[in-house]
Amino acid sequence: DGYSFNYCGGGVSGTVAFVYAGDKELIVKQALAQLKTKDTWLCDPKRMYIEKEANRIYNEIVPENVPEVYFYDEDNYIFGRAAAPESCTMWKSDLLSGLYDFDVAHKAIDSLSKVHNTCANNAEIERIFGDKALFYDLRISPYIEFTVGKHPDLRAFADSVNEFLMGDGITLVHGDYSPKNIMVDGRKIYILDFEVGHYGHPAFDLAFFSNHFMLKTVKNKQWADTTTNMLKLMLDEYFSKVEFMD
């Protein structure tokens, strides 16, 4: 059968194409060793395997909210999954425009809590995602170490955070869980972009997620109360559901 494709923009970590193949619509991604950034930002392209595996596990746990995995080309670091509908909007864009749908918020935090619960203290998950090298390259180095390079007085605090995050794992951490990686179509959501997945501490997902909401209170002060209220409700829901820690 014939196929056609369009390249997608917006990401820094790889080449992405929207592929039309018969009755299927796919997103196909190929990882880059040097990310598309002004400064040097290197990362092993084998992270596509991690993205494929994390996407697969998320789809097994919350299939209603995560696209299906179609294939993985190990030799060329290419990963293919079902595409979210083209009618989707990015949740981040909705929030920045003042559209606050608390049903979407519930689905987002409920999905995260289910994955954290299901994958907690799981030897198979630890086997697949136990190597935190990619997490270091994609999060610790560009976020924490880069900041310390500009503000050396933060070194002691940063070292304690690094030790905590790089220490013993508890569950499957998404690593990039934020409104920019959750697409919305009506009240259906699609959770995407799993390449920072690792067996780590769930506090990272909560902090990363919360940070995006707190930044929106600065960006759009007129909706700050609504933003913090939504975040509080989501965190309360998360902590009411987690079963693997006090």
Residue ranges and their predicted role:
Residues 6-21, 26-28, 160-204:
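Active-site acidic catalytic loop and adjacent metal/ATP-binding pocket
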Residues 8, 18-123:
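ATP-binding pocket architecture of kinase catalytic cores
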Residues 1-5:
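Juxta-kinase regulatory segment immediately upstream of eukaryotic protein kinase catalytic domains
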Residues 35, 88, 182, 199-201, ...:
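Conserved protein kinase catalytic core
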Residues 31, 83-84, 194, 209-212:
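Generic beta-structure capping elements
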Residues 142-143, 243-246:
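Helical subdomain adjoining the active site within ATP-dependent kinase catalytic cores
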Residues 82, 114-164:
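Active-site catalytic-loop/activation-segment of kinase and kinase-like phosphoryl-transfer enzymes
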Residues 53, 204-243:
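Active-site activation/catalytic loop segments of kinase-like enzymes and analogous catalytic loops
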